[in-house]
Design a protein with these regions (language model features):
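Conserved active-site segment of CheY-like receiver
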Residues: 10-11, 91-95, 115
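Short amphipathic alpha-helix used as the core "switch/output" element in two-component signaling
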Residues: 71-84
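Active-site residues of response regulator receiver
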Residues: 61-62, 92
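C-terminal output helix
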Residues: 40, 116-129, 136-137
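Conserved acidic segment of CheY-like receiver
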Residues: 3-24, 59
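Alpha4 helix (beta4-alpha4-beta5 surface) of REC/receiver domains from two-component response regulators
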Residues: 17, 21, 71-72, 95-110, ...
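Acidic, metal-coordinating helix/loop segments flanking the phosphotransfer/catalytic sites
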Residues: 34-58
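Residue-level signal for the "D+5" position in two-component response regulator receiver
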Residues: 34, 65-68, 97
Length: 140
Protein backbone atom coordinates (compact mmCIF):
# COMPACT_ATOMS: atom_id res chain seq x y z
CA UNK A 1 0.00 0.00 0.00
CA UNK A 2 1.41 3.37 -1.01
CA UNK A 3 1.64 6.13 1.56
CA UNK A 4 2.30 8.83 -1.01
CA UNK A 5 1.11 12.21 0.13
CA UNK A 6 -1.45 14.56 -1.36
CA UNK A 7 -0.10 17.98 -2.31
CA UNK A 8 -2.71 20.71 -1.89
CA UNK A 9 -1.95 24.07 -3.49
CA UNK A 10 -4.21 26.46 -1.61
CA UNK A 11 -3.59 29.95 -0.23
CA UNK A 12 -6.84 30.16 1.78
CA UNK A 13 -6.60 28.80 5.34
CA UNK A 14 -10.35 28.23 5.38
CA UNK A 15 -10.33 26.26 2.12
CA UNK A 16 -7.33 24.21 3.27
CA UNK A 17 -9.17 23.33 6.50
CA UNK A 18 -12.10 22.20 4.34
CA UNK A 19 -9.72 19.91 2.43
CA UNK A 20 -8.49 18.40 5.70
CA UNK A 21 -12.06 17.98 6.95
CA UNK A 22 -13.14 16.26 3.73
CA UNK A 23 -10.13 13.94 3.90
CA UNK A 24 -10.94 12.98 7.51
CA UNK A 25 -14.60 12.38 6.70
CA UNK A 26 -13.64 10.36 3.62
CA UNK A 27 -11.19 8.15 5.49
CA UNK A 28 -8.15 9.42 3.58
CA UNK A 29 -5.10 8.13 5.43
CA UNK A 30 -2.42 9.69 3.24
CA UNK A 31 -0.46 12.65 4.56
CA UNK A 32 -1.66 16.00 3.23
CA UNK A 33 0.99 18.61 2.48
CA UNK A 34 0.16 22.23 1.75
CA UNK A 35 1.76 24.68 -0.65
CA UNK A 36 0.33 28.20 -0.42
CA UNK A 37 1.18 29.12 -4.02
CA UNK A 38 2.11 27.66 -7.37
CA UNK A 39 5.70 28.73 -6.75
CA UNK A 40 5.81 26.94 -3.40
CA UNK A 41 4.32 23.86 -5.07
CA UNK A 42 7.12 23.86 -7.65
CA UNK A 43 9.80 24.35 -4.96
CA UNK A 44 8.42 21.39 -2.98
CA UNK A 45 8.23 19.16 -6.04
CA UNK A 46 11.75 20.08 -7.15
CA UNK A 47 13.10 19.39 -3.65
CA UNK A 48 11.49 15.94 -3.59
CA UNK A 49 13.65 12.96 -4.60
CA UNK A 50 12.98 12.29 -8.27
CA UNK A 51 11.38 8.86 -7.96
CA UNK A 52 7.71 7.97 -8.12
CA UNK A 53 7.33 6.79 -4.51
CA UNK A 54 8.46 10.17 -3.15
CA UNK A 55 6.17 12.24 -5.37
CA UNK A 56 2.56 13.05 -4.45
CA UNK A 57 -0.21 10.60 -5.30
CA UNK A 58 -2.36 13.61 -6.23
CA UNK A 59 -1.90 17.35 -6.71
CA UNK A 60 -5.01 19.38 -5.87
CA UNK A 61 -4.41 22.84 -7.34
CA UNK A 62 -6.06 26.20 -6.75
CA UNK A 63 -5.44 28.49 -9.73
CA UNK A 64 -5.44 31.90 -8.12
CA UNK A 65 -2.61 32.00 -5.60
CA UNK A 66 -0.14 34.80 -4.88
CA UNK A 67 3.04 35.11 -6.94
CA UNK A 68 3.55 32.17 -9.25
CA UNK A 69 0.00 30.87 -9.46
CA UNK A 70 -1.56 27.53 -10.30
CA UNK A 71 -1.33 28.21 -14.03
CA UNK A 72 2.44 28.65 -13.78
CA UNK A 73 2.77 25.47 -11.73
CA UNK A 74 0.56 23.48 -14.12
CA UNK A 75 2.70 24.54 -17.09
CA UNK A 76 5.95 23.67 -15.31
CA UNK A 77 4.70 20.31 -14.04
CA UNK A 78 3.52 19.23 -17.46
CA UNK A 79 6.83 20.30 -19.05
CA UNK A 80 8.87 18.17 -16.61
CA UNK A 81 9.25 14.54 -17.71
CA UNK A 82 9.41 13.24 -14.12
CA UNK A 83 6.48 15.30 -12.82
CA UNK A 84 4.36 15.09 -15.97
CA UNK A 85 2.47 11.88 -15.02
CA UNK A 86 1.28 13.31 -11.68
CA UNK A 87 -2.51 13.35 -11.40
CA UNK A 88 -3.36 17.04 -11.20
CA UNK A 89 -6.86 18.20 -10.34
CA UNK A 90 -7.76 21.88 -10.41
CA UNK A 91 -10.19 23.13 -7.77
CA UNK A 92 -10.80 26.83 -8.35
CA UNK A 93 -13.40 29.47 -7.62
CA UNK A 94 -13.16 30.46 -11.28
CA UNK A 95 -15.81 29.24 -13.68
CA UNK A 96 -14.29 31.32 -16.48
CA UNK A 97 -14.28 29.26 -19.70
CA UNK A 98 -10.79 30.63 -20.48
CA UNK A 99 -9.45 29.15 -17.24
CA UNK A 100 -11.04 25.79 -17.98
CA UNK A 101 -9.63 25.77 -21.51
CA UNK A 102 -6.19 26.81 -20.28
CA UNK A 103 -6.10 24.05 -17.67
CA UNK A 104 -7.26 21.27 -19.96
CA UNK A 105 -5.00 22.48 -22.79
CA UNK A 106 -2.03 22.41 -20.41
CA UNK A 107 -2.74 18.93 -19.09
CA UNK A 108 -4.97 19.16 -16.03
CA UNK A 109 -6.67 15.83 -15.42
CA UNK A 110 -9.86 17.46 -14.11
CA UNK A 111 -11.29 20.87 -13.30
CA UNK A 112 -13.80 21.51 -10.52
CA UNK A 113 -15.36 24.83 -9.56
CA UNK A 114 -15.27 25.33 -5.78
CA UNK A 115 -18.79 25.44 -4.44
CA UNK A 116 -19.52 28.43 -2.23
CA UNK A 117 -21.62 26.35 0.17
CA UNK A 118 -19.43 24.50 2.69
CA UNK A 119 -21.39 21.23 2.59
CA UNK A 120 -21.14 21.07 -1.21
CA UNK A 121 -17.44 21.92 -1.07
CA UNK A 122 -16.92 18.97 1.31
CA UNK A 123 -18.91 16.70 -0.99
CA UNK A 124 -16.89 17.67 -4.08
CA UNK A 125 -13.62 17.09 -2.23
CA UNK A 126 -14.76 13.69 -0.95
CA UNK A 127 -15.71 12.70 -4.50
CA UNK A 128 -12.30 13.83 -5.78
CA UNK A 129 -10.51 11.79 -3.11
CA UNK A 130 -12.68 8.72 -3.67
CA UNK A 131 -12.10 8.81 -7.42
CA UNK A 132 -8.40 9.64 -7.53
CA UNK A 133 -7.24 7.67 -4.49
CA UNK A 134 -9.54 4.65 -4.48
CA UNK A 135 -11.09 4.15 -7.90
CA UNK A 136 -8.50 4.82 -10.61
CA UNK A 137 -5.20 3.05 -11.15
CA UNK A 138 -2.35 5.55 -10.91
CA UNK A 139 1.18 5.25 -12.33
CA UNK A 140 3.51 3.27 -10.09
Amino acid sequence: MHRQHILVVEDSDEDFETVLDAARRGGVSRPIVRAASGGECLRQLRATPRHREALPALVLMDLNTPGEDGRDALREIRNDTILQPLPLVVLSASANPRDLLFCYTHGANAYHVKPVEHALHLQVLQQIFAYWLASVVLPA
